Amino acid sequence: MPKLAVVLLVLLILPLSYFDAAGGQAVQGDWRGNRLARDLQRGGRDDESECIINTRDSPWGRCCRTRMCGSMCCPRNGCTCVYHWRRGHGCSCPG
């Protein structure tokens, strides 16, 4: 097989790894593993999450299963986001 044919064959097969067996697009995630995206892909779409849609210099957003506070997620449900002068945003959790 000539080199060009092999390259074209690889380029045709390579995109198939981005799709799962059911024919939908597989979640690729980032290097830490994007658990929330995988959960949403599996059908937890009715879970409401707070999200930052765009992050600087990145096409990815960030979603929280709890409250979104500044650029972070609060550790559990029931927290409120407060602003501390000179320290920025932080979560205030009961108990």
From Swiss-Prot:
Source organism, top-level taxon: Eukaryota
Keywords: Acetylcholine receptor inhibiting toxin, Amidation, Disulfide bond, Gamma-carboxyglutamic acid, Hydroxylation, Ion channel impairing toxin, Neurotoxin, Postsynaptic neurotoxin, Secreted, Signal, Toxin
Localisation per UniProt entry: Secreted
Cysteines paired by S-S bonds: C64-C73, C69-C81, C74-C91, C79-C93
Tissue spec. comment: Expressed by the venom duct.
Signal sequence region: 1-24
GO molecular function terms listed in the Swiss-Prot or TrEMBL record: acetylcholine receptor inhibitor activity; ion channel regulator activity; toxin activity
Record propeptide residues: 25-45
Any single Gene Ontology cellular-component annotation: host cell postsynaptic membrane
Annotated domain remarks: The cysteine framework is XX (C-CC-C-CC-C-C-C-C). Displays a mini-granulin fold, a structure composed of two short, stacked beta-hairpins connected by two parallel disulfide bonds. This newly described fold is derived from the same cysteine connectivity as knottins (ICK fold). The name 'mini-granulin fold' comes from the structural homology with the N-terminal region of the human granulin.
Miscellaneous comment in the UniProt entry for this protein: [desGly-95]VxXXB is a minor form.
Family label: Belongs to the conotoxin D superfamily.
Name of this protein: Alpha-conotoxin VxXXB
Lineage of source species: Eukaryota, Metazoa, Spiralia, Lophotrochozoa, Mollusca
